[in-house]
């Protein structure tokens, strides 16, 4: 006898339909072909125990199971369920009439319970594209997969429920998710708000400019000045995720196994804050299985690197290409995958090894040479990709106790959304450019030229402040964003002056002056 069931293999964001073919003849051997990894090859023992513990006997026969296409590597335990169902059907223990209508995915426990798998959302998208009537997944993956419309998704607890459903002896109902209502209901439900931050108005302004133009930003200041506190509130002032952005972001988190039970589409921009001990593989992705790293999990959101100089220098250097290309290609001997990673890079750091350089309330014990060596842990090419460099001084206690609550995140976000709308219209016909931070030199010449007074201020600043040549285009990009926030088509001298103030680390005398 011969039976087929259907499942899927996930490789990066690409999903391939896999046909599980099972043939039964006389004999006692079990053969599994189709380039499966160790987890797939071990499925025989899990399936045999699951069937036995649910009242079935594993067939005493020569069984050949093939995962087609045979040249595609199959990874993970999600093939357990389609293999088990095919074995039961080929042995005559269940009906095979409806197997072609459904895609199956799930790991089997020894007791027959279905355990969650990674990548349920992209698999559901593939099932719809292949015109399957429905998708059967573990109960824990049900909500995640059901965000895909025009596809019936059935969450099952164990293999017996799957058998009864496919035999037509149970009336399981597909999971129904009101995707749009859930998505929009949670968009603005932030736990953190900028109204919690007392003082630091200049830093809030820098973060608003960064959010409005999609600019990468670094904050330099002593411990306790509020760097991390403000960075964590940045997602609350960014433009809300669109449904298409959310779907792409959620797929990445699904592949990484980061979607919890009962969770659907990600409704807020991701905020990822890896520890400074993170490895290169954990940061950019890869490993034995090509899983997305932190930069891809931050796609369409924020990647925050706290205490930037404490990161391994080689680890930081791998950020350079993803920051430029907004995608990462991971190539290994057995696979090549590409993940998107378009994120805002936000970093914080102390100004010196002791942390108190320029702090009026503490004495810095570092020499200029020590400060310079500390700063040299961050390479020029990486700093070149950071548009805004913002210095932070601690808020004095008397000001902290008297300061009235500042603007809410919602008020700031309204201005950011208006500025982004201007940029969307400006770059409507420019492929791959959505905000000012992504402008090329040609686009800078076209859209970011200041008036004569502004150009003169920029020339003087370049000479007197010893600004590096790489700061020139960054200043113009940021000035363009400041003008957009004010609704000005022309970049004025005031916009240039503010943008110049955000290039502190490019000044040649940085280690010889106070904050």
Predicted segment positions?
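Peripheral, non-AAA+ core regions of ATP-driven protein-machinery
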Residues: 1-218, 225, 331, 471-472, ...
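Short beta-strand elements
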Residues: 18-24, 283, 387-390
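Basic, amphipathic alpha-helical bundle interface domains used for macromolecular binding and assembly
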Residues: 33, 39-44, 59, 66-76, ...
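P-loop NTPase nucleotide-binding/switch module
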Residues: 170-209, 213, 240-295
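Walker A/P-loop
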Residues: 219-260, 325
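The Walker A (P-loop) glycine that initiates the GxxxxGKT/S ATP-binding motif of P-loop NTPases
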Residues: 221, 285, 307
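Walker B catalytic acidic pair
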Residues: 300, 306-307, 318
């Amino acid at each position: 006898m011969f039976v087929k069931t259907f499942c899927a293999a996930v490789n990066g964001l690409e999903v391939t339909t896999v046909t599980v073919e099972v043939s039964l003849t006389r004999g006692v051997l079990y053969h599994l072909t189709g380039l499966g990894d160790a987890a797939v090859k071990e499925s025989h023992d899990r399936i045999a125990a699951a069937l036995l513990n649910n009242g079935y006997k594993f067939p005493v026969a020569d069984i050949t199971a093939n995962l087609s296409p045979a040249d595609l590597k199959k990874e993970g335990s999600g093939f357990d369920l389609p293999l088990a169902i095919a074995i039961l059907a080929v042995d005559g223990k269940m009906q095979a009439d409806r197997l072609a209508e459904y895609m199956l995915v799930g790991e089997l426990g020894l007791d027959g319970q279905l355990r969650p798998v990674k990548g349920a959302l992209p698999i559901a998208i593939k099932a719809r594209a292949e015109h399957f009537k429905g998708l059967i997944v573990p109960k824990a993956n049900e909500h995640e997969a059901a965000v895909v419309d025009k596809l019936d998704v059935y969450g099952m607890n164990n293999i017996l429920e799957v058998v009864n459903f496919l035999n037509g002896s149970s009336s399981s109902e597909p999971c129904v998710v009101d995707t749009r209502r859930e998505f929009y209901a949670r968009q603005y439900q932030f736990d953190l708000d900028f109204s919690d931050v007392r003082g630091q108005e200049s830093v809030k302004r820098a973060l608003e400019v960064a959010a409005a133009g999609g600019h990468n930003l670094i904050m330099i200041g002593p411990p306790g000045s509020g760097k991390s506190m403000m960075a964590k509130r940045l997602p609350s002032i960014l433009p809300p995720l669109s449904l298409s952005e959310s779907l792409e972001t959620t797929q990445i988190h699904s592949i990484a196994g980061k979607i919890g039970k009962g969770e659907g589409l990600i409704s807020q921009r991701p905020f990822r804050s890896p520890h400074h001990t993170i490895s290169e593989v954990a940061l950019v992705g890869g490993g034995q299985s090509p899983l997305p790293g932190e930069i891809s999990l931050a796609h369409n959101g924020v990647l925050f690197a706290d205490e930037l100089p404490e990161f391994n220098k080689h680890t930081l250097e791998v950020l350079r290409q993803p920051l430029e290309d907004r995608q990462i290609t991971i190539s290994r001997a057995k696979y090549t995958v590409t993940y998107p990673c378009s994120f805002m890079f936000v970093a914080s750091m102390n100004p010196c090894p002791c942390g108190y350089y320029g702090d009026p309330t503490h004495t810095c014990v570092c020499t200029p040479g020590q400060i310079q060596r500390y700063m040299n842990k961050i390479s020029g090419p990486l700093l070149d990709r950071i548009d805004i460099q913002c210095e932070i001084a601690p808020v004095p206690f008397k000001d902290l106790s008297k300061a009235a609550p500042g603007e809410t995140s919602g008020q700031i976000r309204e201005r950011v959304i208006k500025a982004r709308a201007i940029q969307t219209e400006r770059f409507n016909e420019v492929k791959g450019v959505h905000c000012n931070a992504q402008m090329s030199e040609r686009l800078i010449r076209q859209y970011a030229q200041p008036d004569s007074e502004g150009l003169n201020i920029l020339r003087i600043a370049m000479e007197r402040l010893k600004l590096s040549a790489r700061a020139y285009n960054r200043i113009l990009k940021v000035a363009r964003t400041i003008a957009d926030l004010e609704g000005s088509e022309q970049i004025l001298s005031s916009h240039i002056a503010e943008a110049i103030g955000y290039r502190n680390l490019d000044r040649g005398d940085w280690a010889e002056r106070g904050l």
